[in-house]
C-alpha cells in the first residue's frame, strides 16, 4: 500500500457507482410502470423519493471524490477520511438500493431483476473490507485528536 492510499477510498467510489446504478434503474422503472392510471414517476411521493435518492447519490459522490483528491495530494493521507468515504458511500448505496426495491414493489426482490442484485451487493458493502461500525470506531479517535474536519 503506497503512501496516501487506502483501499476504503476506492470502495467509497465503487459503492457510489452502485448507488447511481440503483437510482438510474429505479428511475427507468418508475417511468415505465403505470399505477393509478399514470406512470409512477408522475406521482408526487415517488418524485420526492427519487429526488431524495439522487441527492444522496450526488452527496456521496462529491465526498468520495474529495477524499480521493485529498489522498492524491497528501502523501500521508488521512485514513479516517477514507474510512468515512467507505462508510458513507456503502450506507447511501444500501439506502438507495432499498428505496429502489420499495419502488419496484413485488418485483423488487425477484431473482434476475437488477435492483435485487444491486440491493444484495449494497448490503454486502456494509460489512465488506471492515464492517461500517468497526471502521467508524477505528477512525473516530484519530478524527477527534486531529480536529481535521
Q: Predicted regions span which residues?
A:
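Short, conserved micro-motifs enriched in small and acidic residues
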Residues: 6-13, 17, 79, 83, ...
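C-terminal helix-coil-helix/basic helical segment that borders enzyme active sites and/or dimer interfaces
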Residues: 27, 31-38, 54-88, 101-106
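Charge-rich, acidic-biased intrinsically disordered regions
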Residues: 42, 46, 79-87, 108-121
